Curated annotation (Swiss-Prot):
Residues 20-220 are extracellular. Residues 301-325 are annotated as: Disordered. Belongs to the type II cytokine receptor family. It is found in: Membrane. Residues 305-315 have a biased composition (Polar residues). InterPro entries: FN3_dom, FN3_sf, Ig-like_fold, Interferon/interleukin_rcp_dom, Type-II_Cytokine-TF_Rcpt. Residues 23-111, 114-216 form the Fibronectin type-III domain. Its main location: membrane. It is linked to Inflammatory bowel disease 25, autosomal recessive: A chronic, relapsing inflammation of the gastrointestinal tract with a complex etiology. It is subdivided into Crohn disease and ulcerative colitis phenotypes. Crohn disease may affect any part of the gastrointestinal tract from the mouth to the anus, but most frequently it involves the terminal ileum and colon. Bowel inflammation is transmural and discontinuous; it may contain granulomas or be associated with intestinal or perianal fistulas. This is Interleukin-10 receptor subunit beta. One of its GO terms (cellular component) is plasma membrane. GO terms for molecular function: coreceptor activity; interleukin-10 receptor activity; signaling receptor activity.
Length: 325
């Protein structure tokens, strides 16, 4: 160990003495949701400030990505998500430069899955959760990590606030419901992306804590009773309205159209239909040439109608004629 430290110090002193530019240190790729940032650390250099150039291999030719930058990072998010990529960086000072430092990077395998978004809604004694897959850098707004990995699922863990016991579930869809929780209790929930075929898990989201309430849902049997009672009351009300309208109709009809009563003898006559038939056929059919005179029957006064009993049977002698001998 002491020999290695001595060799490193000796190398640094030799580089400083000869004026050689040291290479960048701790070169690494920081990739989250395909936002690929190549990072490094600037080495100690006595002559002045260093600049850096970063390149990537494309069709067997290295292409510049960042040139003469004073930053210690370079954005490679435009690289294809699939396949291996060779990247390299070097330090530069004036016309001098260090050796290249190479790394190999495969975005689809090496990128870190960031925390998903989550929306939590409390409904009585349950928590309704909706998950949002992380978005991808330099892609359409609707393009998410779920579109890249076919086996994408979620890991959800929840616990009572203030306790250490955690429960985990694996939803297959973008939503999940935690039911039958204790009422008036605060629960905390976290979610992360998970790839079963790669056995790769993403980063946990920040905990979201919500308090449940009491289940005030009306039982189904009570709903049925209320519905039946409502139907009965409606039918009863309709029946009452119909009876009231019928009474009003009858009263109005009698008030504006009083009933005309027939004589008793006409009622009896019309009550026997066979009498009507006999009366109809008792009269002979009239001829078209028959002439009818109008006959009026006038009742005689009672005073003038009085006669002697003997007069009713005697025949008068016409004037001017005497008895025959």
């Amino acid at each position: 160990m002491a020999w290695s430290l001595g060799s490193w110090l000796g190398g640094c002193l030799l580089v400083s003495a000869l004026g050689m530019v040291p290479p960048p240190e701790n070169v690494r790729m920081n990739s989250v949701n395909f936002k690929n940032i190549l990072q490094w650390e600037s080495p100690a250099f006595a002559k002045g400030n260093l600049t850096f150039t970063a390149q990537y291999l494309s069709y067997r030719i290295f292409q510049d990505k960042c040139m003469n930058t004073t930053l210690t990072e370079c954005d490679f998010s435009s690289l294809s998500k699939y396949g291996d990529h060779t990247l390299r960086v070097r330090a530069e000072f004036a016309d001098e430069h260090s050796d290249w430092v190479n790394i190999t990077f495969c975005p689809v395998d090496d990128t870190i899955i960031g925390p998903p978004g989550m929306q939590v809604e409390v409904l009585a004694d349950s928590l309704h959760m909706r998950f949002l897959a992380p978005k991808i850098e330099n892609e359409y707004e609707t393009w998410t990590m779920k579109n890249v990995y076919n086996s994408w699922t979620y890991n959800v863990q929840y616990w009572k606030n203030g306790t250490d016991e955690k429960f985990q579930i694996t939803p297959q869809y973008d939503f999940e419901v935690l039911r039958n929780l204790e009422p008036w209790t605060t629960y905390c929930v976290q979610v992360r992306g998970f790839l079963p075929d790669r056995n790769k898990a993403g980063e946990w989201s920040e905990p979201v804590c919500e308090q449940t309430t009491h289940d005030e849902t009306v039982p189904s049997w009570m709903v049925a009773v209320i519905l039946m009672a409502s139907v009965f009351m409606v039918c009863l009300a309709l029946l009452g309205c119909f009876a009231l309208l019928w009474c009003v109709y009858k009263k109005t009809k009698y008030a504006f159209s009083p009933r005309n009563s027939l004589p008793q003898h006409l009622k009896e006559f019309l009550g026997h239909p066979h009498h009507n038939t006999l009366l109809f056929f008792s009269f002979p059919l009239s001829d078209e040439n028959d002439v009818f005179d109008k006959l009026s029957v006038i009742a005689e006064d009672s005073e003038s109608g009085k006669q002697n009993p003997g007069d009713s049977c005697s025949l008068g002698t016409p004037p001017g004629q005497g008895p025959q001998s």
